[in-house]
């Protein structure tokens, strides 16, 4: 690693709430994320909840992008952990486009989708 590169791996619980299931027409109303300890997955920082009703959707998306590290070039600065991350991915991607922002691609970095883990633990059943 070079001296000026970030070398920490940061795991984050990630979840969103929306007004519907279609990212073209529904909007994100909350973004929740919390930094987790890498080895134990225990919370090491407070849960952050960005609320659309306190500002607007574009503002919470911009705040999430700027504060979380999700858009950093260093892929390990924000490793999302959540259940059914495809849902979050489709909303982040489309709602950023709808709000004139650079789309967030949470699958262009390491991630852990707990839905996959649950299916495996349930012998392939969902």
How would you describe each model-predicted region?
Residues 1-70:
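Conserved RNase H-like, two-metal-ion catalytic cores of nucleic-acid enzymes
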Residues 27-32, 36-45, 74-126:
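Metal-dependent phosphoesterase core characteristic of DEDDh/y 3'-5' exonuclease domains
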